[in-house]
Amino acid sequence: MERWPWPSGGAWLLVAARALLQLLRSDLRLGRPLLAALALLAALDWLCQRLLPPPAALVVLAGAGWIALSRLARPPRLPVATRAVLITGCDTGFGKETAKKLDAMGFTVLATVLDLNSPGALELRDLCSPRLKLLQMDLTKAEDISRVLEITKAHTASTGLWGLVNNAGLNIVVADVELSPVATFRKCMEVNFFGALELTKGLLPLLRHSRGRIVTVGSPAGDMPYPCLAAYGTSKAAIALLMDTFGCELLPWGIKVSIIKPGCFKTDAVTNVNLWEKRKQLLLANIPRELLQAYGEDYIEHVHGQFLNSLRMALPDLSPVVDAIIDALLAAQPRSRYYPGRGLGLMYFIHHYLPEGLRRCFLQNFFINHLLPRALRPGQHGPAPA
């Protein structure tokens, strides 16, 4: 088959023109996704030149390039204008960084913190504009939630409340379910589920009026049975189902609901080794003697060490999560789910499509590779395996 010198040149000119236009409009970012798309287009060009006649190669490559750039384009966003957003859990991590970014964009930000004198609260007070208002709130205290609701209604009387970001979260134990006090399950549910539920319900009249947004930070641990994270994971599973229900029920009111499910990021709450050491010592002090003998203190130390080792993979750059929250607040058509982080696509593929035995093996090797409890080790007297 006779080939043209460069039959796809017109397609590449079309792709380049559109890419340049999107870059000038800030609808496209220079980065790995764009470079990967261009590499795939180059490979497709090579195949088309060898397998298709020139007109067909031109059409296929132009169509593929157009689709790729459409997928990479930022979705249309709403103007910030005078929009107000309430964010919980702004002492550290995602909440603090999101509050700073939204304030810089021109939002009116109401940022709740556990302690108005915490380092994070002081940082927000120093770095942000007078538009940002700090509010003290403990999600386990109904009186704190009621006070924040009243302040929010008064503070947004002229602008309305556009968005609620349920970011505050808590995990206080990394241990097998049998070793975890029931109180830790209740505590996680109080913060991660009931507190968010009460606050969200209280703000619905304002959000219905603005036809605004509800954005909640969940976790993959609410979708997959991570070993030793049952207390945290069950609370995140509960809040995800609640938000999905809100998404259905509030659709007629024009409220859009999104859940952010980040991978492992280096936030203070996650990577504070001294805090996890204190929690481990508290756990050891409260385990009944007979149960501790069955599992062994070395088993608990091993789990603790494996958990801390897994945190080495935590990503220091929190911007993917912050960007996902902002997109959920401002995109004309936000997604119902966002998965910022590295490797989540593979994890969810394994969870949904591979056999149960392989899923369990993957989670244990990826997160915590268990040591056998003392009573089950060879040479130890203990219960016979079932």
Curated annotation (Swiss-Prot):
Coiled-coil spans in chain: none
GO biological process terms, semicolon-separated: cortisol metabolic process; female pregnancy; regulation of blood volume by renal aldosterone; response to food; response to glucocorticoid; response to hypoxia; response to insulin; response to xenobiotic stimulus
Gene name per UniProt: Hsd11b2
The protein's enzyme class: oxidoreductase
PANTHER family: 11-BETA-HYDROXYSTEROID DEHYDROGENASE TYPE 2, SHORT-CHAIN DEHYDROGENASE/REDUCTASE FAMILY 9C
Top-level taxon in the UniProt lineage: Eukaryota
Role this protein plays: Catalyzes the conversion of biologically active 11beta-hydroxyglucocorticoids (11beta-hydroxysteroid) such as corticosterone, to inactive 11-ketoglucocorticoids (11-oxosteroid) such as 11-dehydrocorticosterone, in the presence of NAD(+). Functions as a dehydrogenase (oxidase), thereby decreasing the concentration of active glucocorticoids, thus protecting the nonselective mineralocorticoid receptor from occupation by glucocorticoids. Plays an important role in maintaining glucocorticoids balance during preimplantation and protects the fetus from excessive maternal corticosterone exposure.
Name assigned to this protein: 11-beta-hydroxysteroid dehydrogenase type 2
Residues reported in the UniProt entry to bind substrate: S219
